[in-house]
């Protein structure tokens, strides 16, 4: 994740940016033994995310970059990947997905 930390994207105000790498439609499905059984028809909604950036108005010590949290479904907003925003890549070319939410929407932290 150190590569992710260097991307030109940061949270503002009381918001937190979360990042995950969910399986996408078209990804190969592989069994535990390594057999390819097809391609995903539909992408997945991740259960867990990593805190990528914490806004300056989030109370100090609430969470830190790198903390693991469950995805606060229903409380998130999509954030385009910086490479997509800069016109360098298409969304399907990037596995990392970013979302933002208010810090109070984060249900738990795994530390």
Swiss-Prot record:
The lineage of its organism: Viruses, Duplodnaviria, Heunggongvirae, Uroviricota, Caudoviricetes. The gene is 31. Keywords: Chaperone, Early protein, Viral capsid assembly, Viral release from host cell. GO terms for biological process: viral capsid assembly. This is Capsid assembly protein Gp31. InterPro entries: Chaperonin_GroES, Chaperonin_GroES_sf, GroES-like_sf, Phage_T4_Gp31_GroEL. Coiled coil: none annotated. Essential for proper capsid assembly. In absence of Gp31 the major capsid protein (Gp23) assembles into 'lumps'. Acts as a co-chaperonin with the host groEL protein. It comes from the Viruses. GO terms for molecular function: ATP binding; protein folding chaperone. Homoheptamer. Forms a stable complex with groEL in the presence of ATP. It holds the Pfam family Cpn10. It comes from Enterobacteria phage T4 (Bacteriophage T4).
């Amino acid at each position: 994740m150190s590569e992710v930390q260097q991307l030109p994207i940061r949270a503002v105000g009381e918001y937190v940016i979360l990042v995950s790498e969910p399986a996408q439609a078209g990804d190969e499905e592989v069994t535990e033994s390594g057999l390819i059984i097809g391609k995903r028809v539909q992408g997945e909604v991740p259960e867990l995310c990593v805190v990528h950036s914490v806004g300056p108005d989030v109370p100090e010590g609430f969470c830190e970059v790198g903390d693991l949290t469950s995805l606060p479904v229903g409380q998130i907003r999509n954030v385009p990947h910086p490479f997509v925003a800069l016109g360098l890549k298409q969304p399907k070319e990037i596995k990392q997905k970013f979302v933002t939410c208010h810090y109070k929407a984060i249900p738990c932290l795994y530390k």
